[in-house]
C-alpha cells in the first residue's frame, strides 16, 4: 500500500470497485485511490474540474481513462446518498 495516499481514498476505491461495471484488478487499487485523492482534493477546494483536468489526473494516477465517466457517475451518486 502507498502510505502517501490516506486510507479513506482506498476505502472509496474499494466501494467503487464493488459497484463498477468493469471489474477492478488488485493492481488498479492504488492508482484508483490516487485518482480519487486528486479528484476529491480539487472538489474540496472548489476548483473547476474540466474534462481535460480529469484526463490529466487519470494520467498522473495511472488509471484507464475509460473509467473517468463511470467514476464521475459513482461520485455523483455517492454524494447524493
UniProtKB/Swiss-Prot annotation:
Pfam families documented for this protein: DUF2543 (PF10820)
GO CC annotations, alphabetized: cytosol
Domain of life: Bacteria
Protein name, entry field: Uncharacterized protein YmjA
Lineage, highest ranks first: Bacteria, Pseudomonadati, Pseudomonadota, Gammaproteobacteria, Enterobacterales
GN (gene name): ymjA
Amino acid at each position: 500500500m502507498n502510505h502517501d495516499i490516506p486510507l479513506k481514498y482506498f476505502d472509496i476505491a474499494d466501494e467503487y470497485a464493488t459497484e463498477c461495471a468493469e471489474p477492478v484488478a488488485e493492481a488498479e487499487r492504488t492508482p484508483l485511490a490516487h485518482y480519487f485523492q486528486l479528484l476529491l482534493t480539487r472538489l474540496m477546494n472548489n476548483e473547476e474540474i474540466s474534462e481535460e483536468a480529469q484526463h490529466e489526473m487519470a494520467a498522473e494516477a495511472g488509471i484507464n481513462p475509460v473509467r473517468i465517466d463511470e467514476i464521475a457517475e459513482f461520485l455523483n451518486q455517492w454524494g447524493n446518498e
